[in-house]
Regions:
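Non-heme di-metal
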Residues: 1-163
Length: 163
């Protein structure tokens, strides 16, 4: 079973962002190719029975919701691709969505860590938690590498030099 891999999301996002304007791929199609991990988590939830079944089903629903949110982020990226590449309009909104996505990933990682002590699920959740944490770090790296509009100077616009 393949655990949630945030690097797939970043690969899709980067492919959309770096494509020439005339060849921007459809992020929904890319998401269908890459974002299968929510379904894998749902399958995991169906496989287990016992006391944790309801918790696992709740996690699977969260994963599906998370996958839908990521697809929405990709759709927003498609709509604003030229502005995002140039660092102008759309950047703040996209950055905000990515930050919320990273925050959700982090919270899910904490939840997975809390279930590690359960002997039956410990190894599975340890692996999922590690994937979530790695994904959160990758999202933060991506946010750090996004283009920024010009940084305003402290003393206002540049003044012409005096001779």
């Amino acid at each position: 079973m393949e655990a949630f891999d945030s690097s797939k999301v970043l690969r899709v996002w980067q492919r959309v962002r770096s494509a020439p304007e005339s060849e921007v791929p459809d992020p929904r199609a890319l998401a269908e190719e890459e974002l299968t991990d929510a379904a894998a988590l749902a399958a995991l939830a169906r496989r287990f029975t016992g006391n944790r079944r309801k918790s696992l089903e709740a996690l699977a629903k969260q994963a599906q919701s998370h996958g839908a949110q990521l697809k929405g982020i990709l759709a927003l990226t498609q709509e604003n691709a030229p502005e995002i590449r140039s660092g102008s309009l759309g950047l703040t909104q996209t950055e905000s969505l990515l930050r919320r996505c990273g925050d959700r990933m982090h919270r899910r990682g904490v939840l997975y860590r809390s279930l590690e002590s359960e002997p039956r699920f410990g190894r599975t959740y340890a692996a999922l938690a590690a994937e979530e944490e790695a994904g959160s770090r990758l999202l933060l790296e991506l946010l750090g590498s996004m283009p920024r509009p010009g940084i305003p100077r402290r003393n206002g616009p540049p003044q012409p030099r005096r001779r």
